[in-house]
A protein has these predicted regions:
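A structural boundary signal for the start of the first folded domain, especially the loop/turn
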Residues: 2-143
Length: 143
């Protein structure tokens, strides 16, 4: 318990230090800092929670405008650990302004998606801006 609290506090401090807002609880699976998911956020969050419970993993996603120069790997690890410590699972992160995405893996040896699925997601995110469909497809593939 102390370890989880320590990681949460450190993650919040790093988030404040580097300007990356970290504000979510452990029941939040979809973080939409860019407000591109709109009315679909609660439905996607419920779906992610259900898939996570069924799989015994944390399946999460974060969309942000920018990583403030930290990069998607660093931000996804920071946010994931702040929410779930070392629980096994995955986090898809996409930075709109940076045109960069990454799938962070905690306690797992492989990513939940095939290379073909990753390419399809990238096309939807970066080229077509189908954010809701992309997050939904990620959840389906990860589950």
């Amino acid at each position: 318990m102390k370890h989880k609290l320590k990681i949460t506090i450190l993650s919040i401090l790093f988030g404040l230090l580097f300007g990356i807002p970290v504000y979510a609880d452990s029941n939040t699976y979809i973080i939409d800092q860019s407000d591109v998911l709109g009315e679909y956020i609660s439905t996607l969050n419920e779906k992610a929670e259900t898939i996570s419970e069924e799989a015994g993993l944390r399946i999460t996603c974060m969309i942000t405008n920018t990583t403030e120069g930290m990069g998607t790997p660093a931000v996804s690890e920071q946010v994931y650990k702040g929410l779930f410590a070392d629980d096994p699972g995955f986090m898809l992160i996409y930075s709109i302004d940076d045109q960069e995405w990454f799938i962070y893996s905690s306690g797992m040896e492989s990513a939940p998606l095939t290379e073909e699925q990753e390419n399809e997601l990238w096309n939807e995110f970066a080229i077509q801006d189908y954010y809701v469909d992309c997050v939904d497809a990620y959840l389906d593939a990860a589950g």
